[in-house]
Design a protein with these regions (language model features):
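Acidic, His- and aromatic-enriched active-site or binding-groove loops in soluble protein domains
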Residues: 3-12, 117-148, 239, 243
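Positively charged, Gly/Ser-enriched RNA/tRNA-binding surfaces
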Residues: 10-12, 21-34, 40-96, 108, ...
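A generic structural motif
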Residues: 100-103, 126-131, 331-341
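Glycine-rich, mobile lid/loop segments that gate access to catalytic sites or pores
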Residues: 101-112, 118
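Internal hydrophobic scaffold segments of catalytic domains
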Residues: 113-116, 125-128, 153-158
Length: 349
C-alpha cells in the first residue's frame, strides 16, 4: 500500500525506504535466474520501514527474517516445509506447542467468492483488506461489515471509507467468514477457483500429516493477507497468549510470522510467472513476546576496555580480553601509543 511506504525527494531523486524483503528478492531472482539453481532457497535478515501507527511490538522501523523457496517447486511441498520451519523455529525459541497457532488458507478461496459476487475490480482490494481485519483487535464481524459497506468509525472517531458493497454481497461474505470447517467450505463454495484453492490446501495438510507439526497448523479462511502479490497459499502465525504493554495492560500482540505464495510477484520484473513461496518473522515483535516469557534475559552489559599500563604486559592484557570475549563480553585492548591513563579512560567513556 503506497500510504504505508516512506517516500521522499532528495533533490531531483525519488527515494523510497525498503518496505519489505519480498520485492527485492523478486527483482534479484528476475535479474539472476540464469545463474541460480532451479530451486532457489534463500533467507535474509534486514530492517524494513512502514509509515504506520507505532505500538507495542509494532514499529516504523523493524527487523524481518525472511525465508523463501523460488523456482521449479512442488507448491504443496514448499508450503508444508515452511509451516514446519515456523513450528521448529518457534520451538527453538522456547515456545511450547500450545502457545502458538499457524493459521493457513488459500487466497483462491475468497477470490472465487468475490468473482461469484461480481464485485468490481476497484472494490476488491478494500474487500480483501476488510476481511483481513476480522481477527485484529477492535474489529470482529461488525467491524468487517462496516468496512464492507459504507464506512467504519473507530474508537477515536476516525472514519475509514468502506467498499460500498450491497447488503446481499456483504451478507454472503460475512456468512463465508463464519465457516470453520474445510469440508463444509468445500460443500458451500462451488466456484472452480475456490475449489482449486481448497484442493491445494488439502494437499498441504496431507504432507503435514507425515510430520509432527500438524497440531499447530489450523485452517482459518478469514486470513487473506493485505498485500496484493499473494495469490494462493497464505499463512499467519499468532501467539495464544497475551502480553503486557508499557501501560501495564494485557494486549494481543498480533501476527509474529506471516507469508504465502506469490507466483505473479516475479512476473512484474521478468514477464513470466515463477512459483515462489515465503514467510517473514517479525523479529522485534517475537523478541517482545519472548522477553515477557523470560525466554530471553535482557542484560545491560557494558563493553570493557583493557588499559595498557606497561607494554611488557601486553600478552597478559590480550589474555584478559580473550577470557572476556569467551564469556560473551565485548572487550578490547587500548591500541594507541599514548599510555596516559586519563586518555585511556576518556576513550572508555
Amino acid at each position: 500500500p503506497m500510504s504505508d511506504v516512506f517516500s521522499f525527494k532528495d533533490g531531483d531523486k525519488n527515494i523510497t525506504l525498503r518496505y519489505d524483503l519480498s520485492s527485492p528478492l523478486a527483482r534479484f531472482y528476475a535479474q539472476n535466474n540464469q545463474e541460480l539453481p532451479s530451486i532457489f532457497k534463500r533467507y535474509q535478515i534486514q530492517n524494513v520501514f512502514r509509515n504506520e501507527k507505532a505500538g507495542n511490538g509494532r514499529y516504523r522501523e523493524f527487523m524481518q527474517a525472511d525465508f523463501d523457496i523460488v523456482g521449479n517447486v512442488n507448491p504443496a511441498q514448499a508450503n508444508a516445509e515452511l509451516c514446519n520451519l515456523i513450528s521448529s523455529t518457534l520451538a527453538d525459541c522456547g515456545l511450547k506447542k500450545d502457545q502458538f497457532t499457524i493459521n493457513v488458507s488459500n487466497r483462491k478461496i475468497v477470490q472465487g467468492l468475490i468473482d461469484d459476487l461480481k464485485i468490481s475490480e476497484e472494490k476488491q482490494t478494500k474487500v480483501i483488506r476488510a476481511i483481513d481485519k476480522l481477527d485484529k483487535p477492535g474489529f470482529g464481524l461488525k467491524g468487517v461489515e462496516d468496512l464492507l459497506k459504507k464506512e467504519r468509525k473507530d474508537q477515536s472517531g476516525a472514519i475509514t471509507k468502506g467498499a460500498d458493497l450491497s447488503n446481499e454481497q456483504a451478507a454472503q461474505i460475512l456468512n463465508f467468514l463464519k465457516i470453520k470447517d474445510l469440508k463444509k467450505l468445500k460443500e458451500t463454495l462451488k466456484n472452480p477457483l475456490s475449489q482449486e484453492g481448497i484442493q491445494e490446501l488439502e494437499n498441504v495438510f496431507q504432507l503435514l500429516g507425515y510430520g509432527s507439526n500438524l497440531n499447530q497448523v489450523k485452517t482459518n479462511f478469514t486470513i487473506v493477507r493485505g498485500l496484493s502479490y499473494y495469490d494462493s497459499f497464505i499463512v499467519e502465525t499468532n501467539l495464544n497468549f497475551k502480553v503486557t504493554n508499557n501501560k501495564g495492560k494485557e494486549i494481543e500482540l498480533g501476527s509474529i510470522c506471516s507469508g504465502g505464495s506469490y507466483a505473479k510477484l516475479i512476473s512484474r520484473f521478468r514477464g513470466v510467472d515463477v512459483p515462489g513461496t515465503g514467510i517473514s518473522f517479525g523479529v522485534d515483535r517475537l523478541l517482545f513476546a519472548l522477553i515477557q516469557l523470560n525466554q530471553i534475559q535482557v542484560q545491560d552489559q557494558k563493553p570493557v576496555l583493557v588499559c595498557v599500563m606497561d607494554e611488557k604486559y601486553l600478552k597478559n592484557y590480550y589474555e584478559i580480553v580473550d577470557q572476556l570475549r569467551d564469556n560473551n563480553i565485548n572487550a578490547e585492548v587500548f591500541l594507541s601509543t599514548k599510555k596516559n591513563l586519563g586518555k585511556q579512560l576518556d576513550l572508555a567513556n
